[in-house]
Curated annotation (Swiss-Prot):
Species whose genome carries this gene: Rhodococcus jostii (strain RHA1)
Entry GO CC: ribonucleoprotein complex; ribosome
Highest taxon, organism lineage: Bacteria
GO BP annotation list: translation
This protein's name: Large ribosomal subunit protein bL31B
Functional description taken from the UniProt entry: Binds the 23S rRNA.
Ligase in keyword set: no
Record note on quaternary structure: Part of the 50S ribosomal subunit.
């Protein structure tokens, strides 16, 4: 491999924003926030909207994710379509 062309690959903690579940894995992503892991080390913390802990495909639960009233905004703008 060529030297100095690959991004820094390091341990990172990802946190699910809706469930609070955390995962320690390796990634090239960086963050200013940090988290203290159970091994006593501090790692960069990245908060994500959806993980396998909250995604309906993996949880088997169906739910509507309406962020900041986007559905209502769409319905106000274009109207609600009625089924025949």
């Amino acid at each position: 491999m060529k030297a100095n062309i690959h991004p820094d690959y390091h341990p990172v903690v990802f946190q699910d924003a809706s469930t609070g579940t955390t995962f320690l894995t390796r990634s090239t992503v960086t963050s200013d926030r940090t988290a203290l892991w159970s091994d006593g080390n501090t790692y960069p913390l990245v908060v994500v909207d959806v993980t396998s802990e909250s995604h309906p495909f993996w949880t088997g639960a169906q739910r509507v994710m309406d962020t900041a009233g986007r559905v209502e905004k769409f319905e106000r703008r274009y109207g609600v379509r009625k089924r025949p």
